[in-house]
Regions:
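Periplasmic/extracellular, small/polar-rich flexible segments of pilin-like filament-forming proteins
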Residues: 48-141
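N-terminal single-pass transmembrane signal-anchor helix
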Residues: 1-24
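Alpha-helical interaction segments
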Residues: 9-13, 32, 75, 79
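Membrane-proximal N-terminal amphipathic helix
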Residues: 25-54
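Compositionally biased, intrinsically disordered low-complexity regions enriched in proline and serine
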Residues: 21-24, 37, 43, 72, ...
Length: 141
């Protein structure tokens, strides 16, 4: 009888672990999507500061006159990504910028984001899992 009880407990534990793994993977992907949407809103609002007459944006770290300069945008984005966001796949770090636009998603870059000015558009790309890359473009005026 004891052997049967132990076997049943083992089976239940195995099923529970598999179900829990699927649940956490889905939650991480949803958190990465949420981060991406929040970044879109954040950078849209920051760019509007310049249109409304402010002189600086992105944590007061960039002059509005530099909003068309790619490396300035990337520097400001790096500051925000590492201080205000967490990578749901690597919870001990912020959301570091990854390489350049159009990067390929893989296990190593899940949850990472790239923010860059390209052709006077602020482009935000986030790897929400190991295959799916979300992209959004905000016109810079």
């Amino acid at each position: 009888e004891l052997l049967v009880v132990v076997a049943i407990i083992g089976i239940l534990a195995a099923v529970g672990v598999v179900a829990y793994s699927g649940y956490t993977a889905g939650a991480k992907k949803q958190a990465a999507k949420s981060n991406h949407q929040t970044l879109i809103k954040y950078f849209s609002a920051e760019l509007q500061k310049c249109n409304l007459g402010e002189t600086k944006f992105i944590e007061n770290s960039i002059n509005c006159s530099d909003r068309f300069t790619n490396y300035k945008i990337s520097q400001g984005a790096e500051l925000v990504l590492n201080s205000k966001f967490k990578n749901p796949y690597k919870t001990n770090q912020g959301m570091p910028q990854h390489g350049s636009l159009g990067f390929s998603c893989s296990q190593n870059v899940m949850g990472e984001t790239k923010v860059e000015n390209k052709n006077n558009e602020l482009q935000i790309q986030t790897c929400i899992d190991d295959t799916e890359l979300l992209t959004f473009k905000i016109p810079i005026e």
